[in-house]
């Protein structure tokens, strides 16, 4: 290992916050609810009209924003950069954050161990496979020295920023398409005078 680099584990580089049982946090009467981020929404990359709602008054750390790293640790194990809009974090999902390391770093290391986590969950599965927090502590990572981390980050950070930005833009364009296309098809929007 290069001088100044060190071995560590996932729990040392990031915080893995488990979501809430959102059925206990429904919106109050007259309150505009937040969609609930469950495994279904994580897999499809967005919330939709069928997504459950929770109170927007939940603790801020349980609110998911575009660009947050989300790790599904039960059932369908996956890790993703959430770009599906603001929502509430449901149980069986970790919101992954760090005060010490950049997002690209803990995302890459979590994704690196995903295949092993899936195998562990499959071996233990009697009903729904999952991994325990102790598996995160066993998942080894290598931390570069500060100069190397900055050099690598200079390459990785813009790539991850662009991925997040493009996915958010894609979501917004899909919303515009889904709003305008039915109006164009029905003739509610007249485009006959447009010169091409």
Predicted regions and their residues:
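Sequence-specific dsDNA recognition surfaces
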Residues: 11-26, 33-66, 83, 88-89
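A short beta-sheet element
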Residues: 38-39, 57-116, 120-124, 132-133
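Short, charged, solvent-exposed linker or helix-capping segments at domain edges/interfaces
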Residues: 48-49, 105-107, 151
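Extended, charge-rich, solvent-exposed interface segments
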Residues: 127
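Short, contiguous acidic/charged loop-to-helix segments that flank catalytic cores in large enzymes
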Residues: 55-57, 96, 160-164
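Non-catalytic DNA-recognition/assembly elements of restriction-modification systems
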Residues: 1-21, 138, 142, 146-191
